[in-house]
């Protein structure tokens, strides 16, 4: 009984530490200056980082192309000094910044899967508002946050809440019209 209580308390402590987020809040001036508008068509791209040796999912993030293009990199470690960040949302995601983001995650030991789906401007704006309002995400909670943002969005109703990057990628890949590379 004491061993189970000890195990429970240790697990609770670990979960408590992973819930600690590091909020960042760039100034409105910095966000406005960095704003990047790709233009239509509007789309959502899911990025899943996969360990090459184990095949396990290591990270999830979403690129949102709406009235502006941003990346929601929950609990991520990626950083660019010229791109302002607000609670895991990086602004100014032009093609060069996006290539840098993908290159940062894709290494000798990791692959990055890119899954894109075209959506209506209204759906893209809804996802943009959801990522902007989500808040800072604690370590190891990236897919939890990503799936929470997408769950219930029109066209994404089949997605379930999950902590597994590979499971989210599999479900996302089943959506009609998704292209994967």
Language-model region placement:
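Activation targets extended, charge/polar-rich intrinsically disordered C-terminal tails
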Residues: 21-28, 125-181
């Amino acid at each position: 009984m004491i061993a189970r209580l000890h195990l429970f308390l240790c697990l609770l402590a670990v979960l408590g530490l992973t819930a600690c987020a590091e909020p960042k809040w760039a100034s409105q001036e910095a966000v406005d200056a960095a704003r990047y508008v790709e233009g239509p068509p509007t789309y959502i791209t899911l990025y899943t980082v996969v360990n090459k040796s184990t095949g396990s999912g290591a990270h999830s993030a979403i690129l949102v192309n709406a009235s502006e293009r941003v990346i929601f990199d929950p609990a991520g470690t990626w950083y660019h000094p010229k791109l302002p960040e607000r609670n895991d949302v990086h602004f100014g995601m032009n093609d060069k910044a996006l290539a840098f983001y993908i290159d940062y995650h894709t290494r000798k030991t990791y692959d990055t899967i890119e899954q894109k789906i075209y959506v209506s401007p209204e759906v893209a704006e809804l996802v943009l508002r959801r990522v902007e309002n989500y808040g800072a995400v604690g370590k190891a909670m990236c897919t939890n946050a990503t799936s929470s943002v997408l769950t219930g969005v029109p066209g994404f109703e089949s997605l379930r809440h999950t902590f597994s990057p590979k499971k989210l990628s599999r479900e996302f890949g089943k959506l009609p019209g998704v292209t994967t590379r």
